[in-house]
Amino acid sequence: MSSKLFQNKLLLAGIGGFMVGGLASWVVSSDAYTAYHRLPASAKHISEISKSPEAVQMIDNIYRERQRSMKMEEHPSLLQSKYPSNFLSFKDGLIPVFKTFYDPEHEEWISIGLMGKALTGYQKLAHGGAIATLLIESLETVRNLRSSQANSQSTQPRDPIPTENFDVRTPSYSINYKKPVPAGDWVIVRVKDDVARLYNSKSQLLAEALDLQS
């Protein structure tokens, strides 16, 4: 009797193992699984960071700051020109700002991004040049968007340094570094009145850039 019971248990274990193996095989061969694992590493990383609790918390902080009365309009990311794409947007570089808002009540542009670990300068801190590039790019893109809207033209961002135009102004900015920016940290960029300010997730001011051409 015990031998028969043992055989039944062995049979059930074999069937269970076969079903588990079949289910795992189906999951691995499914289109969703295959599509995800064929994504480039950068796409997977952006997919993961966009669900980060810290990123969500940063957005919540913005709403709380404005006492939930701010009417924000979502816009395309500020960082779209070739300038940051060539110099900062590479693996572990400046992760593209995936959310950009315009607050019409306070006339302020708000963007959220991630300073990649490849932008490390001194002792695992974000390089000062990368920080300056991010702030200047934000200033120039907002300037371009305002000009385009005023002239009812295309709102495509431009590079910070104009080229092939003899009627150009000389770019001039004042960069002030307030606190170290850890590489790989989330940051908020706020642009208002020709000043771009960089904050961390705790709303601490890290750096700012003033456009001296205005």
UniProtKB/Swiss-Prot annotation:
Residues 147-166 are annotated as: Disordered. The lineage of its organism: Eukaryota, Fungi, Dikarya, Ascomycota, Taphrinomycotina. The chain crosses the membrane at residues 10-30. It is found in: Membrane. GO terms for cellular component: membrane; mitochondrion. This is Uncharacterized protein C3A12.08. Residues 147-157 have a biased composition (Polar residues). PANTHER family: UPF0644 PROTEIN PB2B4.06. Keywords: Membrane, Transmembrane, Transmembrane helix. GO terms for biological process: acyl-CoA metabolic process. It comes from the Eukaryota. GO terms for molecular function: fatty acyl-CoA hydrolase activity. Gene3D superfamilies: Hotdog Thioesterase (3.10.129.10). It comes from Schizosaccharomyces pombe (strain 972 / ATCC 24843). It is a single-pass membrane protein. InterPro entries: HotDog_dom_sf, PTE-AB_protein.
